[in-house]
Amino acid sequence: MEIRRRPPNPKVRVAHLEYAVPHDDEAPRHILEEIVWEKDREVAQARERVPLEKLKSQVAALPAPRDFVAALKASCRKPAVIAEVKKASPSKGVIREDFDPEAIAKAYAEGGASCLSVLTDKRFFQGGFEVLVQVRQVVDLPLLCKEFILSPYQLYQARAAGADAVLLIAAILTDQDISYLLKVARSLGLQVLLEVHDAAELERALGFEGVQLIGINNRDLTSFDTDLATTETLTATYGEQLRQSGALLVSESGLFSRDDLDRVQSAGADAVLVGEALMRQSDVQQALETLISG
């Protein structure tokens, strides 16, 4: 799958990254491409407001990141749970009206989450880096910045806001993109969850050295349809390669019950990322405890 890019200002493009550019009168072909085009505009605007050098200064003053991977490995609950702080999504609209990131994060920590994921996209998920900052202030758990990362600048944004790990989505990045972003992330001490949805993307992910986390997204980001069989199908074919890679496998999206967790764990998942199933409940701590214990 090719995701076309539409950078609003060619001067901010990284010269060695290659991607298709649509004509000015073309519309995005699906929601994922729309998100990517908007993200290119958003990043260009952010660079104007906050220069990279300022972010670098902020990052230099921070303590070392927490070890996201170690927290998942150390979990006595299997599969380990990455609980997500998410207000809305493009497919479901607002998921939680009474959105209090600090209270939600504390509840997740008390409920047994190994790590947290925080949505930072504004337009489509109603999140923000300020939400990540809020969560960082109230919990000690490792945090994943859940974002559509296209530029190294966003890695500095994530680190400055308190992230310990970042999401890279194979569907929206070339191999050159991924290699370069992995290098920058490592220089910042950020661990990377490299997300795939199909066999071609998983084969690409397995080709990168040192990837510690591979996520299988059960949601097709072009349609937002979800199917847990995605994890089962890919692990049935690539299970041995995944084990040999040494990467932890995270199953993402469409997980609503203990049976769902058992299903993907049986397929080989070491951890799960759960958001909507928890965010729709009035008592998220109880919901998480129930999800974990069954």
UniProtKB/Swiss-Prot annotation:
Source organism of this protein record: Synechococcus sp. (strain RCC307)
Keywords: Amino-acid biosynthesis, Aromatic amino acid biosynthesis, Decarboxylase, Lyase, Tryptophan biosynthesis
Record pathway: Amino-acid biosynthesis; L-tryptophan biosynthesis; L-tryptophan from chorismate: step 4/5
Amino-acid biosynthesis recorded as keyword: yes
Family matches, as SUPFAM superfamilies: Ribulose-phoshate binding barrel
Assigned protein family: Belongs to the TrpC family.
Biological process per Gene Ontology, one example term: L-tryptophan biosynthetic process
Reaction catalysed by this enzyme: 1-(2-carboxyphenylamino)-1-deoxy-D-ribulose 5-phosphate + H(+) = (1S,2R)-1-C-(indol-3-yl)glycerol 3-phosphate + CO2 + H2O
GO molecular-function terms, A-Z: indole-3-glycerol-phosphate synthase activity; phosphoribosylanthranilate isomerase activity
Entry annotated with the keyword Cell membrane: no
First-tier enzyme category under EC: lyase
Record-listed E.C. numbers: 4.1.1.48
Protein name as catalogued: Indole-3-glycerol phosphate synthase
Record Pfam families: IGPS
